[in-house]
C-alpha cells in the first residue's frame, strides 16, 4: 500500500493523519508496515484524504486519479 509514500509526500506525521481521520496512530503505523490490512471503509478514508483512487493506494495502478 502507498500509504507511507502519500503521507510523506504530503509532509504529515502519522499522528496528524491519525487525528485527521479519527484513528489510532498505532493503526496507521501497522497499515504502513503491512502488519495490518485495511478494511474497505478504511481504504475509502485514505483514498478520500489523499484524493487518489483505491487502486492507486493499493498499487494496482500507477495512475493516482479516478477513472472517469
For every predicted segment, state its role.
Residues 2-20, 45:
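Short basic helix-loop element that most often maps to the first helix and adjoining turn
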Residues 41-56:
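DNA major-groove recognition helix of helix-turn-helix/homeodomain DNA-binding modules
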Residues 9, 58-68:
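Short, charged recognition helix plus adjacent turn
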Residues 3, 17-18, 28-31, 57:
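Conserved hydrophobic/aromatic packing and binding residues within compact polymer-binding modules
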Amino acid at each position: 500500500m502507498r500509504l507511507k509514500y502519500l503521507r510523506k509526500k504530503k509532509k504529515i506525521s502519522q499522528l496528524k493523519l491519525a487525528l485527521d481521520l479519527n484513528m489510532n496512530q498505532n493503526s496507521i503505523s501497522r497499515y504502513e508496515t503491512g502488519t495490518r490490512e485495511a478494511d474497505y471503509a478504511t481504504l475509502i478514508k485514505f483514498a478520500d484524504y489523499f484524493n487518489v483512487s483505491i487502486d492507486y493506494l493499493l498499487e494496482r495502478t500507477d495512475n493516482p486519479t479516478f477513472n472517469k
